[in-house]
């Protein structure tokens, strides 16, 4: 059985993703020209977007990675508690930080993470997300760079998973409810 069989509908195609990443890369390159840009990928979900975005950014930049969780295992609901599993390797002092996220959902994780990063004395901290789900927002946080707004559906692909599956789909799709309500 193919992973595609578990998808109810494709929300964002591979072609749409490629075009949007190129557009975001061009905007970020222009906005951060002459600055000391650090792209901070929030793993695991943003790894695919990060790999594509960093190649679309045409100015020098550093990259770093964090593993942060407010979900557990196959849970589909945030716990509201943010746990740093892997912290940054580099120093953010005096740098312009752009958090690279797969999806901005409730905003709880980022609303706690942004102030933590600001304590590292960067010049700025902004957010870039490929997907935004504003209908589920619980925290007062908005992306500075946004790819696509998506409805309140369980989405997978392009780095997003359910129980560590579907990350490698080249598109963003809605998972059939029977898959995650078993």
Indicate where each model-derived feature is located.
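PRPP-associated nucleotide enzymes
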Residues: 1-182
């Amino acid at each position: 059985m193919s992973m595609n069989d578990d998808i109810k509908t494709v929300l964002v195609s591979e072609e749409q993703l490629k075009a949007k990443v190129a557009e975001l890369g061009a905007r970020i390159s222009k906005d951060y020209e002459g600055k000391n840009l650090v792209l901070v990928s929030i793993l695991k979900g943003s790894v695919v977007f990060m790999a594509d975005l960093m190649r679309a950014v045409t100015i020098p930049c550093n990259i770093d990675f964090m593993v942060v969780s407010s979900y557990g295992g196959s849970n589909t609901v945030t716990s509201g508690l943010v746990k740093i599993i892997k912290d940054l390797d580099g120093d953010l002092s005096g740098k312009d930080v752009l958090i690279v996220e797969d999806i901005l959902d409730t905003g709880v994780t980022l609303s706690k993470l942004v102030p933590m990063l600001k304590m590292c004395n960067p010049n700025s901290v902004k957010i870039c997300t490929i997907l935004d789900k504003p209908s589920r927002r619980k925290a007062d946080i908005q992306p500075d760079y946004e790819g696509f707004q998506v409805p309140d559906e369980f989405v997978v692909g392009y780095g997003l998973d359910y129980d560590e599956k579907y990350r490698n789909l080249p598109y963003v799709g809605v998972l059939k409810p029977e898959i995650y309500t078993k």
